[in-house]
Amino acid sequence: MYKRQGKARIAREGKDLTIVAHSYMVLEAIRCADVLKVKGVSIEVLDLRSIRPLDTDAILNSVKKTGRLLVADNGWVHFGVSAEIISIVTENIFDRLLCAPERIGMNNSPSPSTRALANNFYPRAKDLAKIVCKILKKKVDLEALFPKSSLSQDIPDPAFNGPF
């Protein structure tokens, strides 16, 4: 099935905060949004679908609506997609932001070569939720909401069918 590149889609509607994600991080962002919804947190998840061309209009429109931004990057945060998205937002609609944008991605270290090292390398929905709660100044028991997964951190969710 062909999807038009350069056109993002809203994977979840929300009003409190925008999570911009691409590739595998879309699944983690959706999981975060769905879990925090039970605590009254309304998260808009924007699935970029492609990073080149980048749908800057969709990003800016979503952040204008929510006033808050978290970029979930499936790469390193330094010099990556998340840095560029935050630059675009702050250069264009800085006055619409209610707080500083945040980003999450892989730890600033080499890719892990063992499962033990992988556990602290790949961001998961719970990691996104921790940042969302910080941004929104919400106290939520994340341990209760996100039970420990039986999957190793270096094994993607079975619902994902892209490269990992």
Enumerate the language-model features and the residues they cover.
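Thiamine diphosphate
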Residues: 3-164
